[in-house]
Structures are given as structure tokens and as C-alpha cells.
């Protein structure tokens, strides 16, 4: 009797459970964290405490987390252990840690018996990346395909997955079978495209007309509508499409043009499913809130959407889960099925850790759009077969991020997202600043498509909100990658018009052969076939790269992605141009990021609005004069950003206004400014009055802070040599010398209680022939000229100014922004106190 009752009562339950005057600076109390900064810290702490709770509750002798109900009553041995191990791996625990290794070995010893457990096993082994588990991953994938109901290994119609001995499929078992198959695919297992197409067909056949899916397929109207299963259905369509080696776009590998660009069989199904989810969104759904929360994370990550409906899903989910954490570190989100603290904590940590993955690339959504109400949104500008012009390629961004994560960032998990400002009410400049402050968590913004972008204004008209966001994003350190999908001429014309409006003083130009992008990471002569690539220079670096040639079609398909251990394609091979397209993207990303990892999701940057400050009298404010050395305004935002930082972190009254134009060294206005800044890009040729004017200011209490800016290695060497010659000419008896680490300039006393003892910086290679590949932690390296016991010149031969603007470049020898702020603040405070 008991055996009969459990299938009837517990099967739906267990499905959820298992998967479950001179201004003065004075000390200031620590600033109250911004709301988002506070949430970032809370999430970090929550993950740490949750990990400790799970580790403390491991069965140390067996290496597992098995409990009575799931392991014995439900006969799902390994399910809990797999879920917990997956959560710990995603939280950063290493596979070779003895505790983790024991858990992995326990799982490896389990034969395939239940769909849930087998799917989770594969997810764990794919995440752990132990070579010895690869045969198990392939075995499990074959087992899952063999157990698909009605499929007969591909000879029949796939009708989903269920429990052993049960011929009634359910969409929860099916979801975890699919997750296990895709994990196997990612780990290198062989899964034929026909299986993914069968899965696509399964989900499209079983979706209700209203857009939802049920736990069991069948039925009419809205009877049986399930939020968790609809999330699973939409994720299933995404994953099945991602599993295909070759998409249905009908790409010509010789040209990169797709005959069926933007046409996906699942377009309408995805649209209806996402709209239903948006209209019915709630974390508190289904029989297990924890199971639901993890499903929402997966949907957000796979779709790339920051918003599901009108909900900022990760931010809201973090607030919800952090509030549910107990003192012992467990996260208990409810009663009933969520009463298992081990399972609830594991599901919650998967949400917090995977959702927190840094965003490398944001894809910019554009086009006519309508809020249909009730959490549903509709694209208005779509083609006859559902093509959305900004998203003709569904997987290009995902594949680029996967490629960059593996090859450029040594396997560190990274994510992507769609940036869709159309879902928000951004109606003034203050909101623009808030949006850009959030968007800057992603160092690269990807903008591509077909046709004219309707938000691009007419020549001479005021910037649209979209244009303001893009302009401010670049001004604050962001990088734009543009691509004309299929080489679409109308989009290329629209993109060039957009750049003219955003940066009227700068032009898109063909990148020269000498540009570092061609060798930023991959050094392959085959990249020369993309010689038509264009770039826009602004201040310190190239800030926009645009390809009028088709590239996204290659990025859409995994078959073109270079793979470890696989011989590269040779000229004439159909895969050759596609592989080069991936390598080109890798170089652009390496250049744009300087190979520095993005900040965790939720990180925001506080931006300054120049229209709101300095309207009162300027007397008594700390002021900076940035010298003109032949370039009117290099690193124009550097000192503004430094002054804003000082204003916010010390009680220093600063002026955010600039001298306009920047003064030349012989300008008599310099005597009103005792702090001078020189961002060096061109060699210095000061003579006569220029030298005398600056020296007179220095000898009467002034200070010159200078740095060698980002401008290529040869230009850096020339400026550095010229600056040293200038110092010797100005102060022949006071040589430029290294400022010692124990100098008051860098001391804790001078810098609010924390010494400037370590900075992140990219320096020259040991052979002196170029910059290091990556930034490293170093002690600060500053030089100076000292007169009468006071540093009158402080010089960094490694960039400060470009870093203060947030710009990164792989060829730039210099600091990251946080280090530049620390050094700059130390120099300013020194100038006031000496």
C-alpha cells in the first residue's frame, strides 16, 4: 500500500525537492554604503556563511549529504549530494579540495538510475572539469537519451522524461534531463544535433496557446498552468537551441551572410513564454520556493535579461534570500517542501553565486517597443517571420563570453546580459546617470543588427535618451563593439551617424595595421582578412570598434569557435574565416578590458553630474589646473573624477570646474592654482617662459603631479624620456628620485588611516620590449623632485589619468581605477599638508 501511495502523493513533491582659505581635509567617518554596495557586501557574506553551513553538515566519513527522505524513501541516492556539490563548486570551492574530492568521488561511484540524479551528476562533473569524469559524463548522456519516453534513441518521437517504470512524462524530470545533456555537451560529450532538434520539437508541441507549460502535458484552457514549469519550458527552448552545433540561419561560411538571418522556429514560443512569465512573476511560486528561485536564475542567465517582466530579478532575488538566512548560515525560504535546510540552502546559493557572475558584455536592445501592460512587452519592429532587428543572432553574445571566459580569462565564469532601457522609465539626466552607473559593471557594450536604428536623432537635434546613455557610458570608461549583421549597409550607415552625434570631434577610421587590437591576445596573420575594421579614438584610447563586415553569423555557431586540443582550421577550410572571427573578437575584448575581470553583478558606479555642482562661489575651494602640452584636453574627466572621489571620501571642499581651455605652461593663470596636473602623451619641449612659469609656481608652494598616459609603448618611452629631461633642466641640482615606500606621502597618517602600500598596475616586461600581459599587485612606484624637504614634482611613469576615467587597454602600462584614485588622493592630500 505504501508503495502505491508514494507515486501518487510524493512524485510531484520529490520532483521539486531534489531539484531543489586653503581648504583642509579632515578625517571623515566611513561613508554609509550605497544601497547597491551594501547589497553586494550582504550577498558576499551570505554566500560565505551558506558555504560554511553546507560544509559543516557534510557526512565526513562518506563525503555526502544524503538524508533519510530523498536517499531512502524516495530512492534518489545522490540527489542531495549532487545539488550541494554543484552549489559549492559555483561558490568557488575547488574540486581538488579534499572535502570536495570526496563528494565528487562518491557521486562518480553511483550508477545511473534516476533522471534527476543523473542530470545533476553531469552538471557537477562538467563544473568540476576532472578529466577522469569525462567517460561518466558521456555514459550519463547516452543513458538520458536512451531513457527519453517514446524516443527509441532517435527512431521515435521524444515525449519527455519521467521516473523509472512510469510512462507519464513530466516537465520537471524533463528539465533536469536537458540540463544534464547540455552540461555533457559543454564538457565535450558527443550529442548529435538531431537530439537537440527533438527536444525543441517537444517543447514547442507541448506549450499551451496562452504561453505556459504544465507539469504534465495536455489539458485545455489555463488548467494546470505552472510558473515553475513555464520557466523550465522557456529554458528548455533556449538550451536546445544552444546545444546545436549548426543553427538554422543558413550561413555562408565564406562570407558570413545568413540566408535565414533572425529566423528561429522557437521565436514565437519564446515570446509567448516570456510574456506569460512576466505577467505572472513571483518568487513565491510552486511547491518549493527554493526550486523556483533557482529556475528564475537560470532563465535570467540563459535569456540574458536583467528584467523579467518589470522585475530586476537578480537584485530582488538577492534581497529576498539574504533576508531569509539564519544565524547558522542556512537559508530557509519556507515550510513544507522547503523545510530541508540543506536543499533550500543549496538552491539559494546557486541563485546567489551564479547570478552574481560578472557581466562581460551587454547587448544593447533597440527598436520600437510597446509595453502591453501586465508585465508583457512586445517588439513592434519585427519582420514577417519574427525577426527582431537588434537580436537577429540569439547566441552570438553568449558564445563570445564563453570563448573569452575560457581562453582570455583562464576559465573564470563570466556572463552576458541584454541591456534594454525600453523597459524602464528614463526621462531625465539624473536617471541617465543612474542607468550608466549600473551599465558600467559591463566593460563592453555590443550593438548590432539590421536596418536603421530609430533612436538615432537627426543632425543638429538634441541627443535622445538612448544616445545620452551611450555617450555617457563611453565617457565614463565603457567600450562599444558595433557590427553590421550580415554586412547590412543600412545598419552601418545608421551606426556611423550615431557615432557622429555622440562624438562630433572624433571619427570612425580604419584601424591601421599597427593597432594593438590586431595582436592584443591572438597573433594570427589570418586576422588580416578583417582589415576593414574601424575604430574611434577618444582621449586615452580606442573607445569604439565597428565592423561593417559580417561577424555575428560566425559567433552564432559553436562550430567556428576554436577549441582546445583541436588543430586550427587552415586557409580554404570552411571553418577558417569563422575561427578568425572568434579570434578577432577575443582581441577586441582583450583590448577593451585590459584582461581585467569585470566587477561582480550589482556593482554600481556613482557618476557626477557637472550641471549640479559649483554654482556657488569658488573662493576657498581646492582647484586643479590641467596643463596643455599640445593636446587640448587629454583625459578630460580624470581630475573631475579624482576631485569627486576626494569630496565624497574626505571633507575636502573641491572645485569641479575646469579652466577652459586648459592652460599652457606659460599661462599667467597658473599662479591661481597651486596644484597642477600633466597627463603626458606627447614629448615635452618646454623652454624659456614655460619652464620659468611652472618653476616659479612650484617654488611658491605649488606642486606638479604628472603621469605618462596610455599611448602605445613607443610613445610612452618618448614621453617618459622627455619628462625626465625637463625635470633635469628645471632643477639641475635636484634630480628626479624614487619616492620611498615609507615616505609621509604614502603613509597611513596622511591617507585617513590606511597607507598606500599596494596597487594594481601593468608595467613593462622584464625584457623592456612592451607591457606585461596582465595587471599585478605592486608596491606604488612614484618618483619626485624634492626641494627644501618638499616634493614639488610627483611623477608616475605608469598611467594615472586614463585609469581615473575608467579606461582600460591591453597595451596601456598603468593602474586600475581604484589604485589611481588612491595615488591621486594621496598626492592631493600631501599638497595640502606640506
Describe the role of every protein-language-model region:
Residues 357-444, 448-454, 458, 551-552, ...:
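Aromatic-Pro/Gly-enriched surface loop or interdomain linker
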Amino acid at each position: 500500500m505504501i508503495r502505491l501511495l508514494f507515486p501518487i502523493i510524493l512524485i510531484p513533491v520529490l520532483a521539486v525537492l531534489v531539484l531543489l582659505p586653503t581648504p583642509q581635509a579632515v578625517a571623515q567617518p566611513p561613508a554609509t554604503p550605497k544601497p547597491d554596495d551594501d547589497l553586494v557586501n550582504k550577498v558576499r557574506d551570505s554566500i560565505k556563511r551558506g558555504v560554511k553551513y553546507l560544509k559543516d553538515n557534510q557526512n565526513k566519513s562518506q563525503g555526502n549529504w544524503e538524508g533519510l527522505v530523498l536517499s531512502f524513501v524516495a530512492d534518489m541516492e545522490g540527489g542531495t549530494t549532487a545539488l550541494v556539490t554543484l552549489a559549492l563548486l559555483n561558490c568557488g570551492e575547488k574540486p581538488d579540495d579534499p572535502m570536495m574530492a570526496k563528494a565528487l568521488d562518491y557521486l562518480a561511484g553511483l550508477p545511473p538510475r534516476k533522471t534527476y540524479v543523473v542530470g545533476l551528476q553531469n552538471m557537477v562533473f562538467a563544473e568540476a572539469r576532472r578529466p577522469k569524469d569525462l567517460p561518466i559524463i558521456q555514459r550519463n548522456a547516452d543513458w538520458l537519451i536512451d531513457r527519453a519516453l517514446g524516443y527509441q534513441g532517435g527512431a521515435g518521437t521524444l515525449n519527455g522524461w519521467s521516473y523509472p517504470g512510469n510512462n507519464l512524462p513530466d516537465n520537471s524530470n524533463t528539465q533536469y534531463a536537458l540540463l544534464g545533456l547540455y552540461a555533457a555537451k559543454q564538457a565535450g560529450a558527443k550529442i548529435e544535433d538531431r537530439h537537440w532538434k527533438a527536444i525543441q520539437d517537444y517543447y514547442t508541441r507541448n506549450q499551451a496557446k496562452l504561453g505556459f507549460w504544465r507539469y504534465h502535458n495536455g489539458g485545455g484552457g489555463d488548467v494546470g498552468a505552472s510558473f515553475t514549469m513555464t520557466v523550465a519550458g522557456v529554458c528548455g527552448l533556449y538550451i536546445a537551441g544552444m546545444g546545436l552545433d549548426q543553427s538554422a540561419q543558413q550561413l555562408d561560411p565564406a562570407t558570413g551572410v545568413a540566408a535565414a538571418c533572425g529566423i528561429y522556429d522557437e521565436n514565437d514560443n519564446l515570446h509567448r513564454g516570456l510574456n506569460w512569465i512576466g505577467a505572472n512573476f513571483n518568487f513565491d511560486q510552486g511547491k518549493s520556493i527554493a526550486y523556483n528561485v533557482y529556475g528564475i536564475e537560470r532563465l535570467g542567465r540563459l535569456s540574458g535579461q536583467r528584467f523579467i517582466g518589470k522585475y530586476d530579478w537578480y537584485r530582488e532575488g538577492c534581497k529576498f534570500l539574504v533576508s531569509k538566512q539564519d544565524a547558522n548560515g542556512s537559508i530557509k525560504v519556507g515550510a513544507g517542501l522547503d523545510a530541508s535546510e540543506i536543499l533550500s540552502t543549496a538552491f539559494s546559493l546557486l541563485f546567489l553565486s551564479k547570478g552574481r557572475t560578472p557581466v562581460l558584455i551587454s547587448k544593447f536592445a533597440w527598436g520600437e517597443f510597446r509595453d502591453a501592460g501586465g508585465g508583457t512587452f512586445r517588439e513592434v519592429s519585427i519582420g514577417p517571420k519574427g525577426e527582431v532587428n537588434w537580436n537577429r543572432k540569439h547566441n552570438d553574445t553568449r558564445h563570445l563570453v564563453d570563448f573569452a571566459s575560457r581562453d582570455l580569462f583562464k576559465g573564470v565564469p563570466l556572463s552576458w546580459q541584454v541591456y534594454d532601457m525600453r523597459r524602464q522609465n528614463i526621462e531625465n539626466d539624473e536617471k541617465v546617470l543612474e542607468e550608466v552607473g549600473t551599465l558600467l559593471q559591463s566593460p563592453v557594450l555590443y550593438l548590432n543588427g539590421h536596418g536603421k536604428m530609430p533612436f538615432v536623432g537627426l543632425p543638429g537635434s538634441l541627443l535622445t535618451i538612448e544616445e545620452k546613455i551611450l555617450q555617457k557610458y563611453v565617457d565614463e570608461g565603457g567600450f562599444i563593439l558595433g557590427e553590421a549583421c550580415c554586412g547590412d549597409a543600412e545598419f552601418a550607415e545608421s551606426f556611423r551617424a550615431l557615432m557622429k552625434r555622440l562624438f562630433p570631434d572624433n571619427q570612425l577610421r580604419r584601424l591601421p595595421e599597427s593597432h594593438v587590437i590586431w595582436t592584443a591576445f591572438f597573433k594570427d596573420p589570418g586576422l588580416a582578412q578583417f582589415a576593414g575594421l574601424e575604430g574611434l579614438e577618444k582621449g586615452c584610447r580606442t573607445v569604439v570598434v565597428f565592423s561593417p563586415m559580417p561577424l555575428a553569423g560566425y559567433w552564432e555557431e559553436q562550430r567556428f569557435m576554436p577549441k582546445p586540443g583541436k588543430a586550427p582550421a587552415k586557409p580554404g577550410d570552411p571553418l577558417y574565416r569563422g575561427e578568425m572571427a572568434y579570434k578577432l573578437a577575443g582581441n577586441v575584448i582583450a583590448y577593451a578590458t585590459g584582461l581585467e575581470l569585470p566587477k561582480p553583478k550589482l556593482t554600481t558606479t556613482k557618476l557626477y553630474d557637472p550641471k549640479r555642482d559649483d554654482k556657488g562661489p569658488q573662493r576657498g575651494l581646492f582647484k586643479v589646473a590641467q596643463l596643455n602640452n599640445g593636446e587640448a584636453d587629454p583625459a578630460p574627466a580624470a581630475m573631475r573624477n579624482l576631485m569627486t572621489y576626494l569630496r565624497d571620501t574626505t571633507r575636502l571642499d573641491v572645485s569641479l570646474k575646469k579652466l577652459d581651455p586648459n592652460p599652457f605652461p606659460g599661462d599667467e593663470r597658473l599662479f591661481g592654482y597651486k596644484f597642477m596636473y600633466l597627463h603626458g602623451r606627447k614629448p615635452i619641449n618646454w623652454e624659456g617662459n614655460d619652464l620659468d612659469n611652472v618653476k616659479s609656481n612650484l617654488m611658491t608652494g605649488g606642486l606638479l603631479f604628472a603621469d605618462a598616459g596610455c599611448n602605445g609603448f613607443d610613445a610612452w618611452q618618448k614621453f617618459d624620456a622627455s619628462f625626465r629631461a625637463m625635470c633635469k633642466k628645471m632643477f639641475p641640482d635636484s634630480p628626479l628620485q624614487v619616492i620611498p615606500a615609507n615616505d609621509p606621502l604614502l603613509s597611513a597618517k596622511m591617507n585617513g588611516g590606511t597607507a598606500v602600500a599596494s596597487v594594481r598596475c601593468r608595467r613593462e616586461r622584464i625584457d623592456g620590449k612592451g607591457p606585461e600581459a596582465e595587471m599585478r599587485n605592486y608596491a606604488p612606484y612614484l618618483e619626485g623632485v624634492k626641494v627644501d624637504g618638499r616634493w614639488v614634482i610627483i611623477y608616475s611613469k605608469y598611467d594615472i589619468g586614463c585609469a581615473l576615467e575608467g579606461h582600460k587597454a591591453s597595451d596601456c602600462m598603468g593602474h586600475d581605477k581604484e589604485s589611481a584614485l588612491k595615488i591621486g588622493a594621496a598626492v592631493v592630500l600631501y599638497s595640502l599638508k606640506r
